[in-house]
């Protein structure tokens, strides 16, 4: 582990179209090989697809989807007396958002539609309706935390 100080947290700028920091973070998460323009096009096209399909504001649908994806509890491995326990802990707000975006993009990439914008749009709409792979990931995480509730007293 590095002995230097922790790097300062860099603030992301809100995106120009929706004036939202979480949309900027989504664009950064979708981006591959530093191609931000391509990533932004994918995200904005997905949002326009969502607006056409649902008739609602795409940003509201996205925020609903994120609420449905973001985990409240997760398990952390803790070594006590020679054995590892999966200890359920609450997820910090920053990490909730990070995990939610990660799961959303990974689930989108794993889908079968032809283009990434279609996959992302469908996954966001599914998540807003409490279905889809990213919501299932959250449910699995919560189930794991619930199953290991007996070890909650090992929290540190």
From Swiss-Prot:
One GO BP on record is: translation
MF term (GO), any: tRNA binding
User: What keyword terms does UniProt attach to this protein?
Assistant: Ribonucleoprotein, Ribosomal protein, RNA-binding, rRNA-binding, tRNA-binding
Tell whether tRNA-binding is among the UniProt keywords: yes
Q: Which GO terms describe its cellular component?
A: small ribosomal subunit
NCBIfam families registered for this protein in UniProt? rpsG_bact
Role of this protein: One of the primary rRNA binding proteins, it binds directly to 16S rRNA where it nucleates assembly of the head domain of the 30S subunit. Is located at the subunit interface close to the decoding center, probably blocks exit of the E-site tRNA.
Subunit structure comment from the entry:
Part of the 30S ribosomal subunit. Contacts proteins S9 and S11.
User: Could you tell me what this protein is called?
Assistant: Small ribosomal subunit protein uS7
């Amino acid at each position: 582990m590095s002995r230097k100080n922790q790097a300062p947290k860099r603030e992301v700028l809100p995106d120009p179209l929706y004036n939202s920091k979480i949309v900027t973070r989504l664009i950064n998460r979708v981006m591959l090989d530093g191609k931000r323009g391509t990533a932004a096009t994918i995200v904005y096209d997905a949002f326009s697809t969502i607006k056409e399909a649902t008739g609602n504001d795409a940003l509201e649908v996205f925020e609903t989807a994120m609420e449905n994806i973001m985990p409240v509890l997760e398990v952390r491995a803790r070594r006590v007396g020679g054995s590892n326990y999966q200890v359920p802990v609450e997820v910090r707000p920053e990490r909730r958002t990070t995990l939610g975006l990660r799961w959303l993009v990974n689930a989108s990439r794993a889908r079968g539609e032809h283009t990434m914008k279609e996959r992302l749009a469908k996954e966001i709409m599914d998540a807003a309706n409490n279905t889809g792979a990213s919501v299932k990931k959250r449910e699995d995480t919560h189930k794991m935390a619930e199953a290991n509730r007996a070890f909650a007293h090992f929290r540190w």
